[in-house]
Amino acid sequence: MDRSSTLPDDFSARIERTDRTDEATWIEARLRPFESHTAASVVPGGFECYARLLHPSTRRGMTGGPPEVRWAEVSAWSGVPMSKDVQFHQIAFPRSEQSTPPPWRGEPARGTLTLGDATALLESLTRHTSTPSRCWFGVWDGYGGWESRETGGPPRSGVEMPKVELPGRSYLLYKGPIDGATAFSEPSFQTPNLWWPSDRSWCVASEIDLDWTYVGGSTALIQDLLHNRSLEAVPVEPSDSCVFQLAAADAPTFLEATDTLWRDGTVTISTTLGEIEAILTGRGLRSTLAISWKRHGGGSGRCTTTLDGSDSDLIGAFLGMARENLLRS
C-alpha cells in the first residue's frame, strides 16, 4: 500500500525519519513471544496498568448522529452484551432478527486509530509524560511510501536506513513531538503502529491485524483513558489473548461448519437471519471462500474472499461475510 501521495504538507516539519533504532531495544526485551498471541506480544510488559482502545466503525447513512459508531452502540443494537475481552464480530451478529438495520457500515479500522481517537488519546498521554517534545514513532514497513515526501527530496533507501526489527514485525522509525502521532493521519488516517516518549512512561501499540489499540502506562494514565468519554476503552491484562475468538453462542455452529468446510469443501448452515452456503476451494497457503446467502423474507447474494489457509482466518471470513450480507438492509 503506497501512501506517499496522501502525506500532509507539514509532514517533515512535525517528525523526521531516524536511524536511532537502539531507542526501541527496551521494547523487544519486554515483549512476550509473537506466537503467544497475548496483549504483551503486542505492547511491552512491565507497565503498571493496561487498556484496550476499541476502534469505532463508521455510521451508516446520514442519520444526524456522530460519524463514528462505538461498540457499545453496536452491542445495544444487537442485544449481545459486551464483555471485558469483547471482539467486534461477537456483538455485531445478533441472536434474532432486528427491526432496524445495523447503525454501522464496514468493519472498524485495523492497525490504526481514527484521527478523532488519536487526538483524544494525545490529550491524556501528554499529561502523563515528562518528555512530550521527544517521542518515537514506529510505522509498519509493509505500508510503504512514507519516505518519499519526508524531506522534499529523493527518499532515503530502506536499505540505508535501519528499521526497528521486532518479533513478527519491522518498523520505520521516526522522532518528533508527541503530536507527530497525527502527522500520518492527514488525510490518510494512519497513526503509528508503535509509539512512546523518551521517558518510556507509556507505550501505544496498534497491531496491523487488530481493530483495537493497546496502551500500557501508569495506573493514573489508564484510569484517565477508561474515564475519557471521547474514547471507548476497556481494561486489559498483559496475558489476555489477542487472537480471534468466537462468541459462545456462535461457536458450536460455526466451528462445526468450519470442520465440514475443511473436510468436504462445502457446507450449508441456517441462522436466525437466513441460510448461508459456503464453498472452499484450494488448500495450503492460499484458498478461496465463496459464500451465498438468502435472507428470511427475501434478499440474496454471493461474495468471495481469499484466505491464507488458517482456521482462524477461515472462521473470521465466514462470520464476517455472513454478518455483512445477512444484516444488509
Task: Write out the residue ranges for each language-model feature.
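Charge-rich, solvent-exposed alpha-helical interaction surfaces
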Residues: L121-S124, A257, A317-M321
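Short glycine-rich, low-complexity/disordered patches
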Residues: S130-G145, A233-C242, A257-E275, E324-S329
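Negatively charged, low-complexity tracts enriched in Asp/Glu with abundant Ser/Thr
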Residues: E150-G152, R156, A249-I269
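Amphipathic protein-protein interaction modules
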Residues: V164-L221, T268-C303
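Alpha-helical oligomerization segments
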Residues: S206-A248
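Mixed-charge, glycine-accented linear interaction segment located at domain edges/termini
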Residues: D224, R295-S329
